[in-house]
């Protein structure tokens, strides 16, 4: 009892007409509301159990084969696919039977002996429901799912047991307005629309958003008839909580309205972290891997700091090895004479370049202006002699080309 008293308390929302002396105003928060939220388990279990409501379907065994088609064989310059016999119609001569043919059967026709149902471990299903129940107590997850809970006084929302005595839908609407949950029911009502696609022809014409889920604790309660005609509002007995209702589509955070009797039964149905469940044999609530989310506080605690090794301030790091053939400073550390050797090689190279230039300059003689004019005159006289001695002067076509006319 001491551990239970230390747990948070949830306020019970009273309704009009309730006697203040009839019931206590608070109830202890059950451990199932603080269980770890596991969306991975919820998504997997929801995907598996949602398959169990499927109806087997298959195409007809005769589909695509209701004709006496035969292949024409080879020699007609057409494919060997079976062809419809006869004449006088477009159908005659058309290919049949194959999955590539118009009017043919499908590839691998579906059979009704497919494995439609999926088996899920009992403990995994229980963990999924516990996670979904815990998510209903987190306002952020409920709002992220799209529920209108701005006017709701507290999460989880618990109402008095007088709500289970409500018989009329008008009284049920009044109850929802008192606890601030009518906005969500109104949202579900206004979201009714026609389904896109062919589902509208197959008894699935309308779709709508999900409203609040009312969980009651008394078997045969009148609350079922009062709330069942409200669009989007669903009801469920606390002992028959279903993941398809607690997390529709595999998405956590359904807006749940609990009655007091249903909320008090959660402890006995799902147990606690120390005590197993009374209704589910051997089931104990899963514990969170990390109870305290403040990681800095955990690391800096005396218990952990007392066994943690001190910081190594003189850590020896790997030395970066540099290539001495490319890095001069590293080469000088290895061979101090390398600097002198490099300088001597540079000076020797400069000396070789200088000697080469001097040698070339010495070979090149400087010509005076008079010598240049004499060389030019000698060239002209040689050219005239060459023209006069040429046989081409006898032809008129070449005289101008040889310059003889000049």
Curated annotation (Swiss-Prot):
According to UniProt, the name of this protein is Large ribosomal subunit protein uL4z
* Keyword Cell wall biogenesis/degradation assigned: no
Q: What is an example of a Pfam family matching this protein?
A: Ribosomal_L4
- Which keywords, in A-to-Z order, does the entry hold? Ribonucleoprotein, Ribosomal protein
Q: Name any GO cellular component annotation.
A: plasmodesma
Q: Name one GO biological process term.
A: translation
Q: Which Gene3D superfamilies match?
A: 3.40.1370.10
Under the heading InterPro entries, the entry gives: Ribos_uL4_C_dom, Ribosomal_uL4, Ribosomal_uL4_dom_sf, Ribosomal_uL4_euk/arc_CS, Ribosomal_uL4_euk/arch
Q: Annotated region Disordered: where?
A: 56-95
The gene from which this protein is expressed is RPL4A
**Which top-level group of life is the source organism from?**
Eukaryota
**Organism, scientific name:** Arabidopsis thaliana (Mouse-ear cress)
- What family does this belong to? Belongs to the universal ribosomal protein uL4 family.
Keyword Ribosomal protein tagged:
yes
Molecular functions per Gene Ontology: mRNA binding; structural constituent of ribosome
């Amino acid at each position: 009892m001491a551990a239970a008293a230390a747990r948070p308390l949830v306020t019970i929302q009273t309704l009009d007409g309730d006697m203040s002396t009839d019931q206590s105003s608070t109830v202890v928060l059950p451990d199932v509301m603080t269980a770890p939220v596991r969306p991975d388990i919820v998504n997997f279990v929801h995907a598996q159990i949602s398959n169990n409501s499927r109806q087997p379907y298959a195409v007809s065994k005769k589909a695509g084969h209701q004709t006496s088609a035969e292949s024409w064989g080879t020699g007609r310059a057409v494919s060997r696919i079976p062809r419809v016999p006869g004449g006088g119609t477009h159908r005659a001569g058309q290919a049949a039977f194959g999955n590539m043919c118009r009017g043919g059967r499908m590839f691998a026709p579906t059979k009704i002996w497919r494995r439609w149902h999926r088996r899920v471990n009992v403990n995994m299903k229980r963990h999924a429901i516990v996670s979904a129940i815990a998510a209903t107590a987190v306002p952020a997850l409920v709002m992220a799912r799209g529920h209108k809970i701005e006017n709701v006084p507290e999460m989880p929302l618990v109402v008095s047991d007088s709500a289970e005595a409500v018989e009329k839908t008008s009284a049920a609407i009044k109850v929802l307005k008192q606890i601030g949950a009518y906005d969500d029911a109104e949202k579900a009502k206004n979201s009714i629309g026609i389904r896109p696609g062919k589902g509208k022809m197959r008894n699935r014409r309308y779709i709508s958003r999900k409203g609040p889920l009312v969980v009651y604790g008394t078997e045969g309660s009148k609350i079922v008839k009062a709330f069942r005609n409200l669009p989007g509002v669903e009801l469920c007995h606390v002992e028959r909580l279903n993941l398809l209702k607690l997390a529709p589509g595999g998405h956590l955070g359904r807006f749940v309205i609990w009655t007091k009797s249903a909320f008090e039964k959660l402890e006995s149905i799902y147990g606690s972290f120390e005590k197993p469940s009374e209704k589910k044999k051997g089931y104990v609530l899963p514990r969170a891997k990390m109870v305290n989310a403040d990681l800095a506080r955990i690391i800096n605690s005396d218990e952990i700091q007392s066994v943690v090794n001190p910081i190594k301030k003189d850590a020896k790091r790997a030395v970066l090895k540099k290539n001495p053939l490319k890095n001069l400073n590293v080469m000088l550390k290895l061979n101090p004479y390398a600097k002198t050797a490099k300088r001597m090689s540079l000076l020797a190279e400069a000396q070789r370049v200088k000697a080469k230039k001097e040698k070339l300059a010495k070979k090149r003689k400087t010509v005076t202006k008079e010598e240049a004019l004499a060389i030019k005159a000698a060239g002209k006289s040689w050219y005239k002699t060459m023209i006069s001695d040429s046989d081409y002067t006898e032809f008129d076509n070449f005289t101008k080309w040889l310059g003889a006319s000049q």
